[in-house]
Structure formats: C-alpha cells, structure tokens
Regions:
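Partner-binding and oligomerization surfaces adjacent to conserved cores of proteins
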Residues: 1-331
Length: 331
C-alpha cells in the first residue's frame, strides 16, 4: 500500500461518525487489505516463547520506541466555542442536556445547580481544565493497545529497527488462510476479549500534521472520573461518553510522524478501552531467520517454529541481484 492510498484511507477514517455497516464497508474498501502481514522480532526468551505458542501480545503506545507515537495534540482553547454551544442548549431549555451536565458537575466535585447556572449565565475559567487535560496525554497512550506489522518481509528499515540489525527473525502471516487466526477455536477462548471482539487491522497514515485529540482527551478525563467513583448510577453517562468517542481510538492510533513512512506499518487495534494487556493467537505460515543471527539462536528459532507447527522455516540472504531474499534454512 503506497502513501497515496494510505492518505485516502485516512481521509475516509477521519470523516466517519458511526459504526454501521455502510461505514465499515467504506473503511474496508479504503484499507486494501494485504495478502500477508509481517511481524519483525529480536531474539529473546519472550519472543521465542510467543513464537512457540503462536501468540502476539498487544502493547500500549507509551511503551513504543517512538516518543511521538500516536501523533496528536490537545487544544483546550478550542473548548471555548464548544462551551458557548453548550450554553445555547441550556438557554433554549434542553432539560436532558442539563441533566447530563449535572452528572458531570458531580464528577468534577462541583455543586450541580451552581455549575449549570454558571454555565448558563457567564464564562468559566478553563485554566484548571487545561492542566488536567494536559495530564491526560499519558493516560491516552496507556489506553491504546495495538500490534504492529508491515507488508514486506524484506523491509530493510524494519530488519534494522525491530529485528536487532538483521539478528532476529520475521513471522509472516497469510491472511487468506482460515487457520491463521486461531482465537475462538479453543476452550480457553470462551471468556477472552480477542475471541469475542475480533481486532481489526488498518494501515498507518504518516503526516507532519498532528491529529486534534481534544475531544478524546475530554472524554477519557470524564470516563476516568466516573470509573474511580464506581457508581452504577453513572453507568449510562459512561456509555454515553464512550459512544461519543467512536473512531477516535483508530484515528489516534493510526497516525505517525512523516519521518517513519518507510516502516509502511499496519496496526491491529484492540477494540476495548481498558488498561489491560491481552494477546491474540495467530499462526505464521512462514518464518525467516535474520542474515546475522548467531547459529545457536537460529536453532532456537527453528525449534520454536517447529513446535508451533510452522512448516516453512527460511533464512535471509542477499541474492545475485544484490537484493534481500530467502531460502529454506540449513542448520
């Protein structure tokens, strides 16, 4: 998928407002799903165990190597016109909206009627809210879980960055094979979120312009306050806020700085919004061992892949055309 196609996908994503069938079809059509996805790994105890068990773990954005991952900003100043629109609703007698605001006032430690009356009759001081929303930035990154892939197993940038300078390996997943995605096929899957809510995989968009995540930050700020209170009476408000943030997780997760565009990344995004790490079970169709992987680690990779039931175990080499290629491994 080239950069122009990624931009077209992004333009569709940022203009979605619901998750009905028509919206999903538009997004699927724009994403141009590849036939295969690749996952680059260094050699470690964890990566070998996950290879052996056909597991891929989601990671939160605050643990990624790029400190600018989830390339967004929070603009509290833009809340002023939103605030004015809220005042307008109150002055026009929208009682349902007023009740929601009273619930929000309780969450923020303010007297509900005073809050609503102040909102109706005059300006508010946004300084405190600005400080709190700025702190939400790290909380947002902790809530965004994804697994990173690319299309090309010979991507030189990723062999350097994520496979320890050609000393690791790459797992290749055939998306056309029904046996690739294993979640939901075992007894242990009955209560697993990955089996009940199958994650979607989307292309990453690269840009020098950050995404405006102010709405999402405000929503997360409210939801965190509701969760801390653990009050069932506020459950409907929690769901109301959560639904209002539809597609915001995808928009924030799928934008990175332009300088990373050679990664040509795809991301599997976990649909639920909780700070709990989970995994999916996916069986690679092929594993390629790195060009500089030490002999004893080559044996460990081949052994783990064999236990996982992976038939094609290959090694990376440079062919006669001076390009990266792969061939069956010799141990």
């Amino acid at each position: 998928m080239d950069n122009n196609e990624r931009e077209k996908f992004w333009n569709v994503l940022k203009n979605l407002h619901n998750n009905d069938e028509a919206s999903m079809n538009m997004l699927t059509e724009a994403s141009h799903k590849p036939k295969t996805l690749c996952r680059f790994r260094p050699v470690s105890e964890h990566s070998l165990q996950q290879l052996q068990e056909n597991k891929l773990f989601f990671s939160s954005a605050d643990h990624y190597d790029d400190p600018f991952d989830t390339y967004f900003y929070i603009d509290v100043d833009q809340m002023v016109p939103v605030y004015e629109e809220m005042r307008k609703d109150l002055l026009e007698g929208n009682t349902e909206f007023a009740d929601k605001l009273r619930q929000i006032a309780k969450l923020t430690g303010q007297e509900p009627e005073t809050f609503v009356n102040t909102l109706s009759n005059g300006a508010l001081d946004f300084a405190q809210l600005k400080g709190q929303l700025t702190m939400v930035h790290n909380s947002i990154q902790r809530r965004l879980f994804s697994i990173c892939f690319c299309e090309d197993p010979y991507n030189e940038t990723l062999w350097l960055k994520y496979a320890n300078n050609y000393s690791g390996f790459v797992q290749i997943y055939d998306l056309s094979c029904p046996e690739t995605f294993m979640c939901g096929t075992e007894t242990a899957c009955l209560n697993c979120i990955s089996a009940n809510e199958r994650p979607y995989t989307y292309p990453v968009y690269y840009s020098d312009m950050r995404y405006d995540a102010t709405k999402y930050a405000l929503g997360i700020w409210l939801m965190e306050k509701i969760e801390k209170l653990n009050n069932m009476a506020l459950a409907s408000l929690h769901e109301y806020v959560k639904f209002s943030l539809i597609w915001e997780i995808e928009r924030i997760s799928l934008i990175k700085k332009k300088c990373h565009e050679y990664d040509q990344e795809w991301r599997m995004i976990r649909p639920a919004m909780f700070e709990q790490r989970s995994c999916v079970k996916m069986k690679p169709s092929k594993v390629i061992v790195g060009l500089r992987t030490p002999q004893y680690e080559r044996r460990l990779i081949a052994s783990a892949a064999t236990i996982a039931g992976i038939q094609e175990i290959y090694e990376l080499y440079i062919n006669n055309l001076d390009k990266l290629d792969s061939r069956p491994i010799t141990i």
